Amino acid sequence: MTVTKKTTKKTAPKKTSKKTAPKKTTKKTAPKKTTKKTAPKKTTKSLRTKVICISHKEDNDGISSAALIRQAFGGDAILVDYPGQMEALYQVVTDEKLKSLFICDLGLSKKTQDEFIDILTTLRKNKVSVTYIDHHDIDPNVVKALQKIKVKVIHDVNECTTVQVYNTYKSKLNDHASFVATCAAITDYMEDRPIGSKLLQMYDRQFALISATVLTYNIVGRQREPDYLLYLVEELSESKFPHDIPNTFEFAQIQVEKLSQIIAKVKKGLKTMSKLGHMEILDSGASGAVNFVMGLSGKDVGVAYKERVDHGIYAVSVRGSANCKVHLGRIVNPLATSLGGSGGGHDKACGAVVPKAKIKKFITELNKKIK
C-alpha cells in the first residue's frame, strides 16, 4: 500500500493538468493585448486635440486677448515677453497634440519676421490651424507670406488686439467679453478708435477706467509671477470683474506708491539729448517709468531702458507725446535690428530689445532720426 501511494503521487493528474492548462495558452494569445498594440485610430485622434494661445504677458491687451481666446475655444495660454516669443513658438512646434494655435498681441520685427514665417510654415505642414491676431505695424509682405501658407491673419493697427478678438469671435463669447475688450482698449490708449469707442459707450466711463487701471497695475507688478498671470487669464475668461478678483485693488495701491517714488528718481537721474529724454531704470519696469521720463524731460520722446541680465540685453520702452511727428515704431524696428536686436510697435508707443553693448548707440541714433 505504501508503494501504491508513492506511484499515485508521481502520476498525479493535477500536475499534468497544470502543465497543459489551456488558460495559460489563452493568455498568451489574448486578442485584447494585440488590439491595444495595433490600435492606430485611438492614438491618432488623441494627437490633435490641443488648443494653445501664445500671447503678450506684459500688458492688459495681451492678457485679455488670451482670456477671450480661452473663453471662445478653451485650451491653454502661454504668456511671453518679446525676448521669449520665438522660444515659445519652438516649444509648440514639436507638440504632436497641437490642433489649433492662436498668437496674440505679439508684433514682428525685421529680425524675427522670417523666422516667424518659417516656424508657422512647419506648423501648417503639420496640419495645425494657426491664427495671428495683432495691431502692431507690420511689413505687408509678411502678411502676404502668412496668408500664402493659409495662416488666418487678423490685423488692424486701429484697434487693440483684444477688441479684434472680441469683434471676430463675439458669437462664441458671452456679454461680459465686451467689458474685457473695453478695458484692454483703455490701457492701450485705443478707446477712441471706431470699435473701441462704441464698446466704452456701453459702460460707465469711470468704472471702466478704474477697472482697466487696477488690472494693468496687477499685470505690470507681477511680471515675475507667471502663475498669477495665468490665473488672471482664467479669471477674466470666467467673466470676473477686476474687483471680484481677490486683492487686486490692494495690490494696485502698492504699485501706485512705488510709481510715485519713481517720479523723484526720474527727476534726479534722467538725461536729455536734443530730441529726447532717456534714463536707465534699476528698480522697476521700464514701461512704468517711460512716461515720466518723457514728461519730466520736456521733450516729445522719452526712452526708458532696463537691463535683462539673464538675456544680456536691455528692454527698452519708447513713448512719444501728441506733438511727436514721426512714427516711432517704424524708426525703432530697423534701428534695433541693425544693432543686433529687435523692436517696433505703434507710432507713439513702441519697444525694443537691444544688446547691452549697443544701448548708447541706440539712443544716439534714435535722437538723430527724430525730426
Kindly give the residue locations of the regions a language model identified.
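Glycine-rich, acidic loop segments that terminate in or are immediately followed by a histidine
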Residues: I63-S65, K97, G277-K371
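Short, structured active-site "lid" loops
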Residues: D95-F116
